């Protein structure tokens, strides 16, 4: 019966895609990458036509977003927005209506300050004085009540003092919060706002926007795509239902190689970025269209758990990223083996590092007929600038033991202001750390702490917590579990490029736990990782004599390599997802 159930599960795995949520990252098309400010009513309508006729709507792409370039200044008497008479001679509402008639959603653009980016960098003078600043409610009413738009991208060129000619010094939190309130005042609760500030704004953004840009503008080059991926590797803790790290509009189908296009789209999918196509849909290449319509990849992006894949390992220069699908802490997961290097790499993937035990059935999300089975480890060769993405179903789910610092949450984290002056923690590249990153500049306030909010324990109980830290002088870490302070540790690893460890015993409750590292008064050490391992008393549960008997073939017993065995062997075994000692 066990084999039959596994076979049935594999059939389901290979013939269905992940459950699609209603609040997943925005999917659609945006005008900026191809057209810049040189847009028109006919161009926008043509993209809506193509989205439907080419089958993109059928796989989930449902937004047509008008970016910068439609402005015509403001009325001198009452300040209402004027629309470019040549590019949009009939105004915006007929265009939005046309998009809606196609069964699609319509998006628009503005700036949090006075002037748009196009007015500054593209010579589009009609974009001066047209931003939200001074007109928050007036413009929100026009966009969302009068025209019926469903999405808005709000730039910050007019709000940043080093960009705008007025030298306005506007506060990002104040401006985006005010605009969000103006949208709320329209009575619309379904509008998605994207905050385009070109860096992670701060954790306050959750209360203002549906998504937010995390980097500078993308361009159609591998270095740009690679850099954006690198900056988002450590942002998984800031992604949740209705709140997404925006890796910028897609450059797929423009000038990247076929392999780079696959990596670009695949990583945007598994990392839960919004998916906004940037090429001209009217002339899209068949190869590009086939990639963008790959349902198995889209399902990863729109999965109902709303997770961004997190870094689980760095092997031979390649990153392993993983996330749950359909069920938290279940046996179905998606993982990527990402090769940012300029040469092909062969990687030995230890499935236990992905918390997958026993026989693992998987398929390549790019080539669904490429089905694999593996126990313990499997080998994959990844092209230069490439990625292999798999959807996997395991016989058993192992408890996660390694939590990298770059998967933790810092409540003060932001990338806009000088973090040292603000005393806010950040994530930094560090080649001496286990996955190439660390969390640093932590402490000096209770809020500036590092915490993992998703430490799962199947049964609860006693665990060994090991902290990998970096500190060239004596500093303290206060360890808290589920809001209760456990212990304060004095740490000194003997150098700022040397990882030291401290181990203590903690108690976890059954289910989800939060582990927090803090120092309310002074700087604390930089953090590489934590290990969380069950201990009873040595990190392993003892097997009682009655457990030596396997009563039926459904008992889940494995050796440490993940191979299923009929009876526990001498030493450490895995029984029903827990390490036990015979």
Listing of model-derived features with the role each one plays in the protein:
Residues 14-16:
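N-terminal signal peptide c-region/cleavage motif recognized by signal peptidases
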Residues 135, 185-186, 190-280:
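Glycan-recognition surfaces
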Residues 268-271, 276-278, 314-356, 385, ...:
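Carbohydrate-binding surface patches
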């Amino acid at each position: 019966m066990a084999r039959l159930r596994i076979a049935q599960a594999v059939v389901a795995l290979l013939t269905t895609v992940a459950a699609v949520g209603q609040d997943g990252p925005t999917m659609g098309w945006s005008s900026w990458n191809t057209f810049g400010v040189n847009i028109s009513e006919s161009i926008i309508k043509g993209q809506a036509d193509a989205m439907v006729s080419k089958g993109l709507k059928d796989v989930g792409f449902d937004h047509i977003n008008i970016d910068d370039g439609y402005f015509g200044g403001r009325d001198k008497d009452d300040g209402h927005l004027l629309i470019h008479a040549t590019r949009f001679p009939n105004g915006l509402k007929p265009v939005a209506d046309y998009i809606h008639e196609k069964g699609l959603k319509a998006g628009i653009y503005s700036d949090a300050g006075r002037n748009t980016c196009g007015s500054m960098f593209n010579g589009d003078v009609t974009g001066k004085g047209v931003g939200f600043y001074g007109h928050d409610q007036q413009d929100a009413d026009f966009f969302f009540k009068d025209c019926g738009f469903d999405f808005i991208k709000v730039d910050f060129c007019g709000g940043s003092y080093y960009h705008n000619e007025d030298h306005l010094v506007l506060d990002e939190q104040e401006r985006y919060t005010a605009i969000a309130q103006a949208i709320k005042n329209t009575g619309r609760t379904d509008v998605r706002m994207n905050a385009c500030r070109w860096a992670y704004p701060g954790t306050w953004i959750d209360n203002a926007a549906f998504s937010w840009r995390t980097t500078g503008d993308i361009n159609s080059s591998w270095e740009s795509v690679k850099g954006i991926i690198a900056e988002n590797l450590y942002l998984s803790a800031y992604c949740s239902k209705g709140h997404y790290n925006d890796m910028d509009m897609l450059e797929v189908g423009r000038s990247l190689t076929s392999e780079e296009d696959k990596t670009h789209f695949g990583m945007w999918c598994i990392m839960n970025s919004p998916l906004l196509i940037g090429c001209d849909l009217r002339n899209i290449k068949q190869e590009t269209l086939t990639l963008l319509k790959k349902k198995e990849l889209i399902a990863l992006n729109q999965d109902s758990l709303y997770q961004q894949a997190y870094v689980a390992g760095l092997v031979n220069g390649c990153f392993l990223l993983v996330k749950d699908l359909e069920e938290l802490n279940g046996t179905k997961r998606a993982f990527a083996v990402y090769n940012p290097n300029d040469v092909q790499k062969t990687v030995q993937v230890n499935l236990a590092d992905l918390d997958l035990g026993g026989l693992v059935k998987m398929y390549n999300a790019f080539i669904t007929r490429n089905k694999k089975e593996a126990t313990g480890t499997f080998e994959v060769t990844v092209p230069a600038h490439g990625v292999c993405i798999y959807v996997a179903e395991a016989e058993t789910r192992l408890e996660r033991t390694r939590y990298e610092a770059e998967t933790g949450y810092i409540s003060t984290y932001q990338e806009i202001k000088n973090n040292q002056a603000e005393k806010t923690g950040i994530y930094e590249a560090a080649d001496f750390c286990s996955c190439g990153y660390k969390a640093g500049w932590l402490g000096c306030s209770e809020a500036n702490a590092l915490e993992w909010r998703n430490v799962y324990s199947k049964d609860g109980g006693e665990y060994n917590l090991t902290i990998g830290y970096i500190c060239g002088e004596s500093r303290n870490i206060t360890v808290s579990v589920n809001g209760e302070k456990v212990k304060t540790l004095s740490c000194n690893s003997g150098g700022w490029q040397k990882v030291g460890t401290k181990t203590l015993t903690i108690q976890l409750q059954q289910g989800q736990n939060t582990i927090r590292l803090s120092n309310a008064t002074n700087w604390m050490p930089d953090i590489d990782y934590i290990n969380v391992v069950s201990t009873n008393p040595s990190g392993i549960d003892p097997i009682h004599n009655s457990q030596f008997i396997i009563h039926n073939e459904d008992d889940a017993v494995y050796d440490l390599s993940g191979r299923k065995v009929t009876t526990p062997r001498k030493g450490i075994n895995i029984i029903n997802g827990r390490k036990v000692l015979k």
